[in-house]
Amino acid sequence: HPGELTYGSTGIGTDDHLAMVLFERMTGTKLNHVPFTGAGPLRSSVLGGHVEVAGMNLGEVMPMGNKMRVLAQASAGRSKLAPDVPSFTEQGVNLVFSSERGIVAPAATPADVQRRLAEALRAIAADPEFQKQMAQQFTEMDYLEGAAWKARLEKATAEFNTLWKTTPWSDNAK
């Protein structure tokens, strides 16, 4: 029954939506996409039975306890923060996808200011209390310095451009 199962995302072009677009492509599944304006409205819609499934981050779902059931996470293996949740990979779908978060500054920022910011961010990422707070929010950290993060973003951009050419997501919303 292609297109009969409805899934929600936190909006067109968001990380949650793109992960579901990849899921559809990798599995040959056709789902009916309903975009929402964020995690709160999407959670309410799932709990209210208005959509059957949703693409969301662990941090948006895990605090709900037993009200929502996480079926899979888009990682190579199980998260240490949610070890009972199987990965797509272990269920036969090689879907590995993460949400990127970072700090940026204007290109004209002086080198000494960039250096101080990088040092401060490195210290924050290494701080055990900060790491504990991130874990409490079900957010796994993968700290990368500027050049490494830029390289990851450039690779992701190329992958998204390819995805866009084969599956434009504006056409994917019904």
Model features per residue range: what roles?
Residues H1-T37, P41, F88, V93, ...:
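Hinge/capping helix and adjacent helix->loop/strand transition within the periplasmic-binding protein
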Residues T14, G38-G40, S75-G77, M141, ...:
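Residue-level detector of flexible, active-site-proximal loop/helix-junction positions
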Residues H17, L22-M26, G48, V53-P83:
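A ligand-binding cleft/hinge motif common to bilobed small-molecule-binding domains
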Residues M26-T29, A111-K174:
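An extracytoplasmic/periplasmic, membrane-proximal ligand-sensing/linker region
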Residues P35, G49-H50, K67, G92, ...:
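Conserved functional loop/turn residues at catalytic and ligand-binding sites
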Residues P35-G38, N57, E145:
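Short loop/turn segments at beta->alpha junctions
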Residues L42-R43, V61:
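Short, hydrophobic alpha-helical packing/hinge segments within bilobed ligand-binding/sensory domains
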